[in-house]
Every structure is written in C-alpha cells, then in structure tokens.
Amino acid sequence: MLIQIADLFTPAEAAQIRARLEAADWVDGKVTAGYQSAQVKHNRQLSEQHPLAQELGGLILQRLAANNLFMSAALPRKIFPPLFNRYEGGEAFGYHVDNALRPVPGTAERVRTDLSATLFFSEPDSYDGGELVVDDTYGPRTVKLPAGHMVLYPGTSLHKVTPVTRGARISAFFWLQSLVREDSQRSLLLEMDVAIQRLNQDTPGHASIVQLTGVYHNLLRRWTDV
C-alpha cells in the first residue's frame, strides 16, 4: 500500500518551512543509518537535537493527528519524531530497507517501522532527480510530490532516492508503528473505512452502514496489536 496525502501543508507554509531549513546547519546523513544503509547513503540531515527539527517535528505531528486519511491509512500507535534531510550536488540514497526497530532518542521507547513516510518541502520543478523509488509487488513506483504533500509506504519496502543533479531536495521523513502491523490487513481496513464514509454520504442513515461499521471494528479488534 502506497498512499499519497495531499496538502498536509499549504504551498505557502511549505515555502516558509523550506526557507528556515535552508538556513539551518546540516550534518552527514549517515548518523541515522544502519550499517548496510550507510554504504549507500549520501545526503545531509538536520541533527535530531536541533531546536528547529524539534519545533517542525511537533508541527508535523499536529497536522498528522488532524488528517483523516493519515489516521485511517496508518492507524498509528507510535510515531518516530520526524527527521529532516537534504540532497543536492549528486547526493543520493541507494536501494535499502529501513531498520525494523528505531530507538527513540532520550527514551527507552522503540518504534517498529511498519510504515515509512516522506513529506516533501521542495517543489518538484526546483530540482532534477531526487525521486523516491519504492519497489512493491507491481514493480518500482516513482514518487516526486509537490511541496507540502506526503507519501506513506510499507517499512518492508526496498526503496531508494535517485541522485539530485540540480537544485536541492528538502524533506521530512519518519517511521511509525501501526496498531495493525500487516500491510494487507491495513489496506483492507482502509478500503472498508472509505466505503463506509461514501455510503454515509450517498445514503445517510442506511441500516447497512451500522452493520458494516460493526464488521470494521470487529476486524480491527481481531488484528490490533496493542
């Protein structure tokens, strides 16, 4: 399941965030990579302890909590604090799979990376390359979204970022642990949730809506991992 979430931030908001990030101090992106990933990771990141990273990360979490599509698709239990990266001058991140577990800095918490997310802050016409390529059962899927838009995809996916040959690609990225760890089960629940919402719009008050909602919650009860 690969889900695009539009307009988490407006273009104007994304531009303001991008301007603040462009002026920040960046460090080698290998600091958050595992051993294998570090071999193919060539980018820069904002330090996890940087005040700007913490401020913007908190703002992203607020927007996510208010986004119905995100909440329905992800069914989040834990969200790793968002990180920020920058690619330019040929920088890229070769094919890799994200670490299964991420310790949350400064806590005893660990987040199982059921889902990965990239939130774009650079407009796609402002840089060449920098596509996120996610391999799934249907083959490679290429993602390059407008500023303020986000993509959500399974943490089990093999993926890469192609070299940025012009301009700079600035984005946020993070992982989350879902209440439902299996991607196929989350996909079914999302389809059912969307169908129930459409039925509510088309035939409000229909008795079948209550029955279908009960089926949704019984499946969620069966599959939830808390």
Curated annotation (Swiss-Prot):
Residues 78-178 form the Fe2OG dioxygenase domain. Pfam families: 2OG-FeII_Oxy_3 (PF13640), PKHD_C (PF18331). 2-oxoglutarate binds at residue 169. GO terms for molecular function: 2-oxoglutarate-dependent dioxygenase activity; iron ion binding; L-ascorbic acid binding. Binds 1 Fe(2+) ion per subunit. InterPro entries: Oxoglu/Fe-dep_dioxygenase_dom (IPR005123), PKHD_C (IPR041097), PKHD_hydroxylase (IPR023550), Pro_4_hyd_alph (IPR006620), Pro_4_hyd_alph_FE2OG_OXY (IPR044862). Signal peptide: none annotated. Fe cation binds at residues 96, 98, 159. One of its GO terms (biological process) is DNA damage response. Its cofactor is Fe(2+); L-ascorbate. SMART domains: P4Hc. Its EC number is 1.14.11.-. Keywords: Dioxygenase, Iron, Metal-binding, Oxidoreductase, Vitamin C. It comes from the Bacteria. This is PKHD-type hydroxylase BP3529.
